[in-house]
Each structure stands twice: as structure tokens, then as C-alpha cells.
């Protein structure tokens, strides 16, 4: 029996995908199993060449809340995300990468907060990193520790992007007012750019609970310092800001990164010793 669609969903969940056959089904299930059910799922395939589309179409046939679109391959996630928003109807927009997972209460916690706090444009939650992670990974960027979370624009600029895209719920009006994601081919930090645009005039809030399982792949860790420097420089020029994290990248100091990561690893082990990792909610799959 096909699950019928909510005619007036409050939340639109946007999932871009490309060759995601390995994880896409679990990702979609983690949305379908939410305790909060007033949503639609907008999936936009960016020209997959594997079995991704067949998997999605099978799920779409069982649940009318799933709406599937296919576009020509762009190679830039900002394009299918913006396309998905245009096809959606919810008052709130959530983004979910095709290999990440949500916990069961993610949408409920966030929608309740935005309903009670009209002055807040978007909320984000903490994330738990899993997948191809090792001690060689940049732990500073991965660990979901609340002491390094940005809570305002100043924090974003000072600390860098601590907001996992899959953890965000944003008001449609706020998203559209800033023009959505930057689709410029030179823009490689489109999520960070979006938070910076929103925070120029709007407030955001951290919900200190783990609501996202953020999957890490070994290929995500690059030693290409020049490319990282280029991305940050572009963002600085685009938004006319100065990012301290850019200065750190320009130093290209492995020693400084190592010391920084060891400090954060120590904090992580302390959190683990008090049950931080074990007591988290599980994915809704």
C-alpha cells in the first residue's frame, strides 16, 4: 500500500544525489522514520550512472511523500539543491546529503524550536562522524563537540564552518532572500557561504543534540593545500571578510595541525569516558 502524501507539508527535505546506490536507501529511510511526519522529500539526481535512480524510483512508488527529479550532470551540489528548493512547497527547508543519516527526533526538535522562536532564521544540530575515519583525519573539523560550535556570525568567521549541512533546518523565506546556494563554478564552499550570507542579517541557533550521522569517506581528506587556500580566498573576496582559518591554511604547518588535533583528540577521549559517544541517539533506519 502506497503511503499518501501530506498535501501541505511544513518541511521540505532536499536530497541531491550522484552515484549514491550504496547509501541512498538508508538515507531516505532515516527521513521516512522521523517522529515528525509533516514533510515531503525532494530528491534531485545529478546524472547518476549507477543504480541510484532505480532504487529511488522503487521507494517513490511506495511513498507519495517522495518526489524524484533528474537533471543533467552539473558536478556541483549547489545546483540540484537549489533546483530541489524550487520544486518544494514547505515553509521550512532541510538539506540532507545522500550518504548521511538522521536520528528519529531531528525534525521534531528543530521545527519546534523555529516555531517558538520567530527571530531565528535557521537551526543546526551536532553531528556524529562515522565511516572512513582514522586518527590521521582532521579531528578538529569532525568532532561534534559543543565547545567549538559557532553561535553567531562572529563565531563563524573566527572558528570557520562548524555547521554540518545535513543538520540544518532553515526558513524558506530566509533562504530565498539571500538567493540560495551560490552556483558559481568557482564557489567550492557553498554551504559556508550560505551561513555567512544568512548571518549578515539573521540569527541562527545550535541545538546541542546529535541529530545527524555524518559519513566520512577517505577521499574527502585532501593534502592539496593550494586548493584549500584557493577556496578560502575566493570566499573571502566574495563576502569581503577575513577568515582567521585562511591564515592558518596559508601557514601550511603540519606541526600546528598535529598539535591542534591532539588537543581535540584529548577532549574527545574525555567526552567518550563520560559516555558522550555511547549515549547518542541512533540513526532512524
Question: Where in the sequence are the language-model features?
Answer:
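N-proximal low-complexity "stem/linker" segments adjacent to membrane-targeting elements
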Residues: 1-32
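Acidic helix N-cap motif at the loop->helix transition within catalytic regions
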Residues: 22-25, 50-59, 101, 105
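Glycine-rich, basic loop-to-helix element that forms the pyrophosphate-binding segment
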Residues: 71-88, 109
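Conserved nucleotide-sugar donor-binding catalytic segment
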Residues: 86, 125, 142-231, 235
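Short aromatic/hydrophobic "clamp" motif used to bind/position activated sugar donors
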Residues: 93
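The conserved acidic donor/metal-binding loop of glycosyltransferases
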Residues: 97-101, 126
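Conserved donor NDP-sugar-binding/catalytic core segment of glycosyltransferases
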Residues: 105-139
Amino acid at each position: 500500500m502506497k503511503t499518501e502524501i501530506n498535501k501541505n507539508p511544513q518541511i521540505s527535505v532536499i536530497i541531491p544525489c550522484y552515484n549514491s546506490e550504496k547509501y541512498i536507501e538508508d538515507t531516505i529511510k532515516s527521513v521516512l522514520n522521523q517522529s515528525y511526519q509533516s514533510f515531503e522529500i525532494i530528491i534531485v539526481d545529478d546524472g547518476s550512472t549507477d543504480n541510484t535512480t532505480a532504487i529511488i524510483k522503487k521507494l517513490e512508488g511506495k511513498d507519495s511523500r517522495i518526489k524524484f527529479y533528474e537533471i543533467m550532470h552539473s558536478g556541483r551540489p549547489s545546483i540540484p539543491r537549489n533546483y530541489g528548493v524550487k520544486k518544494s512547497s514547505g515553509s521550512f527547508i532541510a538539506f540532507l546529503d545522500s550518504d548521511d543519516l538522521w536520528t528519529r527526533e531531528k525534525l521534531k526538535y528543530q521545527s519546534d524550536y523555529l516555531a517558538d522562536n520567530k527571530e531565528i532564521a535557521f537551526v543546526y544540530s551536532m553531528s556524529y562522524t562515522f565511516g572512513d575515519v582514522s586518527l590521521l583525519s582532521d579531528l578538529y573539523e569532525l568532532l561534534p563537540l559543543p565547545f567549538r560550535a559557532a553561535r553567531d556570525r562572529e563565531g563563524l568567521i573566527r572558528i570557520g564552518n562548524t555547521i554540518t549541512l545535513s543538520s540544518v533546518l532553515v526558513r524558506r523565506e530566509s533562504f530565498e532572500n539571500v538567493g540560495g546556494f551560490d552556483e558559481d563554478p568557482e564557489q567550492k564552499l557553498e554551504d559556508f557561504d550560505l551561513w555567512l550570507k544568512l548571518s549578515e542579517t539573521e540569527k541562527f541557533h545550535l541545538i546541542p543534540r546529535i541529530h545527524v550521522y555524518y559519513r566520512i569517506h577517505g577521499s574527502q581528506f585532501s593534502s592539496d593545500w593550494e586548493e584549500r587556500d584557493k577556496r578560502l580566498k575566493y570566499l573571502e573576496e566574495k563576502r569581503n571578510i577575513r577568515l582567521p582559518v585562511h591564515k592558518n591554511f596559508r601557514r601550511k604547518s603540519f606541526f600546528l595541525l598535529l598539535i591542534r588535533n591532539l588537543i581535540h583528540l584529548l577532549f574527545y577521549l574525555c567526552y567518550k569516558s563520560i559516555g558522550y559517544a555511547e549515549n547518542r541517539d541512533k540513526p532512524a533506519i
